[in-house]
UniProtKB/Swiss-Prot annotation:
Signal peptide: 1-29
Keywords of the record: Glycoprotein, Secreted, Signal
The protein's name in its UniProt record: Uncharacterized protein Cgl1651/cg1859
Annotated InterPro entries: Ig-like_fold
Organism name: Corynebacterium glutamicum (strain ATCC 13032 / DSM 20300 / JCM 1318 / BCRC 11384 / CCUG 27702 / LMG 3730 / NBRC 12168 / NCIMB 10025 / NRRL B-2784 / 534)
Region of interest (Disordered), residue spans: 41-66
Compartment list: Secreted
Highest taxon, organism lineage: Bacteria
Length: 185
């Protein structure tokens, strides 16, 4: 009687085999279910694995990269958490930024940009992994008038104008309703 190969499950004879937890046991259609079953341990699979195939390539998404157009960003590296990357590429990094073969993103953004870019890492075997990196490059707010930190007191003159307009509107409504009331009597 011949058994199946554990990895290929190809019939080598007339018996069928079921593989469970690395043990191959014969199984027949007319098998006595109360009979004692002996199991044979299969040979270890000593097939060498292809380089880079043992660990899949996996990347970790860094936090949002922020900055101001015209000022260099603090370099950020895309971290490889599984496998070993040989190169990094991106076709849609914001203008002025570069990524090197270690996954380090550097440069100076040329214009405002808020969005993401796809980073692709490749290992020696050609296996690719991708991650999306978020960017937020905006102009700094103008500092013409120093802010006190409270929007309620920053423009007190505007608040005074608004309150005066509301009081005037209420006075007009009360005056009109009084005249209307006396007219209807």
């Amino acid at each position: 009687m011949k058994l199946f190969s554990r990895t290929s499950l190809v019939a080598l004879g007339t018996a069928a085999a079921i593989t469970l937890s690395g043990v191959t046991a014969p199984a027949f259609a007319d098998e006595d279910s109360n009979a004692a079953v002996s199991a044979l341990k299969t040979a270890e699979d000593n097939t060498p694995e292809a380089p880079g195939a043992s660990t899949p390539l996996k990347l970790e998404q860094p936090g949002t990269i922020t900055g101001v157009p015209g000022k260099a960003i603090t370099p950020v590296t895309v971290k490889v958490v599984a496998g070993e990357a040989e190169s990094f590429t991106s076709d849609n990094l914001p203008s002025g930024l570069l990524i090197d073969n270690t996954g380090k993103i550097t440069g100076t953004p040329k214009k405002e940009f808020t969005g993401s870019a796809k980073i692709i890492a490749k290992n020696e075997a050609g296996v690719e992994a991708e991650v999306y990196v978020n960017f937020d490059f905006n102009e700094e707010p103008s500092s013409e008038e120093p802010s006190s930190g409270s929007s309620d007191t920053d423009n007190i003159e505007n608040w005074i104008k608004i309150i005066t307009a509301v009081i005037g509107a209420l006075t007009t409504i009360l005056t009109f309703s009084t005249k209307l009331d006396s007219f209807l009597k």
